[in-house]
A protein has these predicted regions:
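A Zn2+-metalloprotease active-site environment signal
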Residues: 6-17, 24, 28-257, 265-288
Length: 288
């Protein structure tokens, strides 16, 4: 992937090495890890458990006090993340008005190590990358890319770019008004249906990542041989069925929150081929 040619984003905040702020006011790292593992075992998004615990302890109010370094990081992986974010900004600032008649407001990207605070509560490396709609920010510990390579054998710069573009896809969903409606609905239904709604949200973000890649390649010729295979392999490696099989030896479809390997590969490919937001409407699709 020719990411070196991308414009770097100014919407990056680097908190790596800073640790958690606020000391006694927030959840401890051990608590965050336990809640993350509990969410994984129960099929519940860990961010829901952590965010709830933050509100109960009064620890969610101080996250804005943490300020990291602004601007383009100097290390290679930091520059990579900044460049991919910049390219998503360039793509969506054109595609969203053209296809959805909405102006694109770019999200922020926070790089952290181990743990930090977000508008949605505590963020811990074990949770993986995530998007917080409350502060319209993507959070990622870049060591996740090393874990992708080590644990899932899913490395490569375009595979890593797909992960970032997926989280930006959630921001696009938020700008389209989809996330607030889904979250409201999830509070009204049972766990199985709430999980199914989560799967639709995640698969749409996979597809939107494909839409970004389609237009990035069309405009900048950014993809190189093998890149698409890298991303599809990554999508396969992080499917709920595959992860559950690895971690607990069995698959529980009702607890899926992101979609199966087959679904994630198929929706990413749909976005790559179509380049259209409309093609990513998982909420009206007869087949997920």
């Amino acid at each position: 992937m020719r990411w070196e040619d991308f414009r770097t984003s100014s919407n990056v905040e680097d908190r790596r090495g800073m640790g958690l702020p606020g000391g006694a006011g927030g959840l401890g790292i051990g608590t965050i890890v336990i809640l993350g593992l509990l969410g994984w075992a129960l099929g519940i998004d860990p961010r829901i458990l952590i965010g709830g615990a933050e509100m109960m302890t009064g620890g969610g109010s101080g996250y804005q006090q943490q300020q990291g370094r602004q601007g383009t990081p100097q290390d290679e992986m930091g520059r990579f993340a900044s460049a991919v974010l910049g390219n998503t900004e360039d793509v969506w600032s054109t595609v969203l008005p053209q296809q959805a008649n909405r102006q694109y407001q770019a999200p922020k990207l926070v790089l952290f190590s181990d743990a930090t605070r977000s508008g949605c509560g505590g963020a811990q490396s074990a949770m993986g990358p995530f998007y917080c709609p409350l502060d319209q920010t993507v959070y990622i510990d870049l060591s996740f890319f090393e874990e992708m390579q080590r644990r899932f054998r899913a490395g490569g710069d375009f595979a890593y770019a797909y992960v970032l573009a997926h989280e930006v896809g959630h921001h696009v969903e938020n700008q389209l008004g989809i996330l607030p409606r889904v979250q409201e609905r999830q509070q009204q239904v049972g766990r199985a249906e709430a999980n199914q709604l989560s799967v639709r949200v995640e698969l749409m973000a996979d597809c939107l990542a494909g839409v970004w890649a389609h237009h990035s390649n069309q405009r900048w010729r950014s993809l190189e041989p093998g890149d698409i295979e890298e991303a599809i392999h990554a999508a396969e490696a992080i499917g709920d069925d595959r992860l559950q099989k690895q971690s607990q030896g069995r698959v529980v479809p009702d607890s899926f929150t992101h979609g199966s390997s087959e679904q994630r590969m198929r929706w990413l490919t749909t976005g790559l081929k179509a380049g259209q937001i409309q093609a990513c409407d998982t909420f009206r699709a007869s087949r997920l």
